[in-house]
A protein has these predicted regions:
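Alpha-helical transmembrane segments of multi-pass membrane proteins
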Residues: 19-40, 103-109, 173-181, 367
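Long, contiguous internal "core" modules enriched in hydrophobic/ aromatic residues
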Residues: 3-11, 20-26, 81-82, 120-129, ...
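Hydrophobic alpha-helical transmembrane segments
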Residues: 62-70, 140, 284-292, 359-363
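N-terminal signal-anchor module of multipass membrane proteins
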Residues: 1-67, 71-74, 381-384
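Membrane helical hairpin/interfacial module
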Residues: 49-116, 128-131, 135
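Membrane-interface transmembrane-helix boundary segments in multi-pass integral membrane proteins
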Residues: 14, 34-36, 55, 130, ...
Length: 384
């Protein structure tokens, strides 16, 4: 199938330069702190919060990659041709976000190179965490193969379609294992629920959708008039509708979790009362609900500036939500006693914040390289 080249804004070297600078600075600080202090550079420990901001960052980026694949699958798997004009760009960003999440996890493990041989040589077949790594690795490979097919103008052959379906299946399996890692921990009541994988599924789709909106505007200079007819039609029609619908579903999930947690008197769920006293929770809620109300207006949701602002607000809110989900599940002490505080205090260190910068920098750097090397605006001729 032939490829139709979309009209892209000129390559912006600012993204490439900023991502390189962020990568160099963040890696330098993290490596220095790890060399000087070891894992003590992170404000986590085995007595309380053992998974902190780095794990929340990892979850955020890999689930954003998952959501981007869901968005691309609307065209690749379910044949909604209106999404084809952004599929190639979205698939490449999914690869970049996944590698950004892996980079954060590698440094959080304490020794970023030891895992290359330690994990394969200590294969734990009964561990969801182990299979999460296997399926995410398979998912990455399938994404790269699918992108190679698209880059070679093979969009809809039998093998290309099978790769798209296989990538979707692999990421669902990886996503299910990631949700199970949290949802199967009975000693952590905030996480322990069959709802956890479903919550991850809904928020992953939303984060992928808003990331697709932001990267599309970035590629076109944040102006709809720079877009091709196919991209502009998508951004004025189906895409904001998809964002609004998925945002409404996520708000219901958040409301259900909070309401259930506040109503229940089960030990360990008192953390939901503490969340209501958190400024971050209210910022998250205001960003989600406010964006949803704005997108309900048909006239407003078609405007580029509104889409950019709401997408950015929702993406930040989802990052806050990932942090709250990961950390709040651990702040209730497992072992009670008069010497144990009601809730464990945790504040991310500079090294942990630098891993956020590292993940974002890796993601944008890989995306910028792809923007420079490939025609990310290409789409099948039949979709235009």
């Amino acid at each position: 199938m032939s490829t139709h080249a979309q009209a892209n804004a000129p390559f912006n070297p600012v993204v490439l330069g900023a991502s390189i600078a962020g990568f160099v600075v963040s890696v330098g600080i993290v490596l220095y702190m790890l060399n000087a202090q070891g894992h003590a550079a992170f404000n986590t420990n085995n007595d309380g919060v053992s998974w902190g901001l780095p794990i929340a960052t990892y979850v955020f980026f890999v689930l954003t990659s998952t959501g981007l694949t869901f968005v691309a699958s609307l065209a690749m798997v379910f044949n909604l041709k209106g999404f084809y004009p952004v599929v190639k760009r979205v698939v490449w960003l999914a690869v970049a976000a996944l590698l950004g999440g892996f980079a954060c996890l590698a440094f959080e493990l304490g020794h970023p190179f030891r895992m290359l041989w330690a994990i394969p040589l200590s294969f734990q077949v009964t561990s969801p965490m182990n299979w999460m790594g296997v399926f995410y690795s398979l998912y990455l490979l399938l994404l790269l193969l699918k992108f190679h097919k698209m880059n070679a103008n093979d969009w809809d052959s039998g093998s290309s379609r099978k790769l798209g379906i296989a990538a979707l299946v692999a990421v669902i399996l990886a996503h299910g294992n990631l949700g199970a890692i949290f949802g199967m921990l009975a000693m952590r009541p905030v996480w322990y629920s069959a709802q956890s994988p479903l919550y991850f599924l809904a928020t992953a789709f939303l984060s992928g959708a808003v990331a697709a909106v932001l990267i599309t505007y970035l590629a076109h200079g944040f102006k709809q008039e720079n877009m091709s007819e196919g991209v502009r039609k998508l951004m004025k029609g189906a895409m904001p509708n998809v964002v609004a619908a998925s945002l409404g579903a996520v708000i219901l999930f958040v409301a259900a979790r909070i309401y259930t947690g506040l109503w229940s008197n089960a030990d360990g769920l008192e953390v939901f009362d503490a969340q209501l006293r958190s400024v971050w929770f209210w910022l998250e809620l205001i960003a989600l609900v406010g964006s949803f109300l704005v997108l309900l207006n048909r006239r407003l949701r078609g405007q580029g500036s509104v889409q950019i602002l709401t997408a950015a607000a929702v993406l930040v809110a989802l990052f806050i939500g990932r942090y709250e989900f990961v950390v709040s599940g651990q702040v209730v002490p497992l072992f009670k006693g008069s010497w144990v505080p009601g809730l464990i205090e945790y504040t991310p260190s500079l090294s942990e914040w630098m891993l956020v910068v590292l993940s974002l920098s890796v993601t944008l750097l890989i995306y910028a390289v792809g923007e420079k090397m490939f025609n990310l605006g290409g789409s099948p001729q039949s979709a235009n």
